[in-house]
Amino acid sequence: LASRGALIVVNDLGGAVDGAGSDASAAQKVVDEIRAAGGEAVANHDSVSTPEGGESIIKTAIDAYGRVDIVINNAGILRDKTFHNMTSEFVDPVIDVHLKGAFNVTRPAWIHMREQGYGRVISTSSAAGIFGNFGQANYGAAKMGLVGFTRVLAAEGAKYNIKSNVIAPLALTRMTENLMGAIGDKLDPSLVTPIVAWLAHEDCDVSGEIYSVGGGRVARVFIGETQGFYK
């Protein structure tokens, strides 16, 4: 996005995979890379898991650039455990970051988007949410929640030219680097970014859609209903 002229707020609390701790250098490293390549970016280190954190992220954008046109909900943590052994300490933080985090950031941005009659919201779901994955009842519930979140925003944002879509990416990231093994070499995040750039573009006319993306492949995902029968 920065290479195409977008002015970026890089938010990253810099916590561990399970959400513990923080490290301001995570966001600053990306900002430095963007600036070195000739782009513009500022860092923000707030947690998306609180309303105050979400408001601060959007305020950073308004203070730096005067408006907010694009929100990409991409924060995530993992606390995997089989359902038999899962307790609220594994569920609540995951819901707070993935699902409530998307709400906390998008809600203050939505006010500006409605007023200006334009906005693009891209949320990050997962195959674990859409199709399910062993040991991830918490994560899957949060990620499928983002599908419903996205489709409602698409409906409510239509008359304000706000488009909302969701991606289910497969990529090697700081969160997944210890999970993928050799296949991770073929899953560079740069193979995901083109669809994000497209969904964020002013010419993009789709809304309420789900896209699976990774390794150079993009596929539309949909929820279907059979013809059914009448008794």
Residue ranges and their predicted role:
Residues A24-Q28, H45-K59, S88:
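The beta1-alpha1 cofactor-binding region of Rossmann-like NAD(H)/NADP(H)-dependent oxidoreductases
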Residues I34, T82-F83, F90-I95:
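Substrate-binding pocket helix/loop in short-chain dehydrogenase/reductase
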Residues V166, G184-K231:
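C-terminal helical subdomain
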Residues A37-E40, T60-N73, R79-T82, Y118, ...:
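A glycine-rich helix->loop->beta "capping" turn
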Residues S126:
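Residue(s) in the substrate-gating loop at a strand-loop-helix junction
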Residues S3-R4, H112-E115, F131, V147, ...:
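Active-site-adjacent segment of SDR/Rossmann-fold oxidoreductases
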Residues T106, A142:
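Active-site helix of classical SDR
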